[in-house]
């Protein structure tokens, strides 16, 4: 008898300083959509090359019952304290929650039912055109659809057609659900402002440029050949990112359209968080609560010159939570708690949550005369 393995589906992200939704939940360890540009696939984060594994819902339930009906959140436990604080969960950051295997296993549907029971809000990110038999709650469950192009593209070999995904979007909106659009990755010569025109009643837009995994040379070469982008257009910032001056020019027509339709938006590139118009890069309209101490929130509240003291005032008990387990031993630098990591790395120009990391551009012009 073949037994499907399970895995711990609820985790705290090591990107807690740059992401307002550091509680990450994934239903599956695989992704059938097979997007060529997927960094999770090409960094082997979710073990995509191995057999399908499904999220362990039972372990999530036990944790929630302990936190809300038992002994409470454990002191110093980052996941426990993030949950207890009421932060929205993000489902689908590493693998799609509504890929075809959802029809058989229904892990995402079960997650919806469990979070309804405990009153937990969840943002689901997907490229799918269906949620199968899932029954989301309009108040607790929101959606973020990833849209890179409006024509079928070899970069997304197994993704449903753009037409069917728009019909899915339309059905969610017409049923009263909040839905955002994530233009990620934003690919030169592929992604353009027509996406804004089509999804002009979206609750939020997030823009984030194409990123490549430098250690995976085969992946880099394949994507460069498929997109026609020269390698010189990229600069290394951990991953290979399009140069900020290139992204700045590419985003201008998108931002103009977003301003025209009065759609709130965020720039999710780490060096451009200060250009966002929302406190959370996934969209304030799509969440119940973000952490509030990430750098997008700091830029929104204090401007690009926010200080370490500004961050510390928002940390609360999270600052004393253990976070070293989120990093490999060679990246811990003796730090143990969330507060330790901030104090050690905040002033480094290479640190994505430092104001020194932000690009030189202060805003994106929305009118021709501003240029």
Locate the predicted segments by residue.
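Conserved AdoMet/S-adenosylmethionine-binding subsite of the radical SAM
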Residues: 75-250, 257
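Conserved Radical SAM active-site core
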Residues: 2-144, 150-153, 171-174, 339, ...
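Auxiliary Fe-S-binding modules of radical SAM enzymes
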Residues: 2, 195-371
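Alpha-helix termini
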Residues: 45-47, 189, 275
